[in-house]
Amino acid sequence: MEYGLHIADFTWRSGAANLGPALARHVRNAEAAGIRRITVMDHFWQLPGLGPVEHEMLEAYATLGFIAAHTEKAMLHALVSGVIYRHPSLLAKQVTTLNVLSGGRVGLGIGAAWNEQECRGLGFPFPPVAQRFRELEETLQICLQMWSDSEQPYEGAIWQLERTLDSPQSISRPHPYLLIGGGGEKKTLRLVAQYADACNLGVSGGDLPTHKLDVLRRHCEDVGRDYDDIEKTAMIAITPESTATGVAELAESLAGVGFTATYVYAVGIDEPECVVDVIRGAIERG
């Protein structure tokens, strides 16, 4: 099992004025602990389940650039980008830019977006769910076309691009790592089967999302995709009461049903080094 650190909270004991040095120290410690992936949320307000919306939150792609400058080996991406927050060609270019500047370490995690409160508050359009999924599929198509050698026009129902030029191309070939987050059985997992390198599923109360994997397998059969070509990743939440042994045991259970990577995030922990300590302990337990 490969462990990732998912940073979902920037309200740390060190305070907002010290976020830069604290974040740099946090990601360096994570990499030194053997953590192979580092991700951030793509939100502008804190999520209600993790803290008050007024708590500190940093923009994802500027933050990934900062993290890339303070790490050397870890793979980096948003977990996950809301499709409605950026024009797809801008998103593709942002990921390409970070991929090049990081030496091929930055990928794209993306989903259909859901946070209506945040969108209404900041003036982002929040279309109905069916349109958000249409935007998601077209965004996936645009990104993959821009990350290829094609400069042909793109004609979608929502987006039209006259020339999909993206120079320089990403270092990662054939394209940056592409993960789709969410477990929606009709649309999300179908898009995973069609376009993605990886899926990302939540773990609720220790229950393994094995049914979602069965659904993904059926979608792969429908579209002619090799199910084993898709990486299966999961989320693990830890609290102040969590132990390295507990995390390692849950990760072992996930590995037993086909997951190869897990992203660990904190709930109610205001000292980021405590999160790294738990993950380090889980890694040491194998």
Predicted regions: what is each one?
Residues 9, 44-45, 82, 112-116, ...:
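Active-site-proximal loop/turn and secondary-structure-junction residues that shape catalytic pockets
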Residues 3-7, 38-40, 75-79, 106-110, ...:
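Hydrophobic faces of well-ordered beta-strands that scaffold small-molecule active sites
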Residues 34, 70-73, 102, 191-199, ...:
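Glycine-enriched alpha-helix->loop->beta-strand junction motifs that scaffold or abut catalytic
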Residues 50-51, 78, 84-195, 210-222, ...:
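Internal, glycine-rich beta/alpha segment that forms the wall or movable "lid"
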Residues 7, 29-31, 36, 130-174, ...:
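An alpha-helical appendage that flanks or caps ligand/catalytic pockets
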Residues 1-70, 176, 265, 269, ...:
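N-terminal beta1-alpha1-beta2 module of alpha/beta enzyme domains
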Residues 17-30, 91-94, 181-194, 242-255, ...:
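Short, acidic/polar
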Residues 65, 69-87:
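Structural motif corresponding to the early beta-alpha repeats
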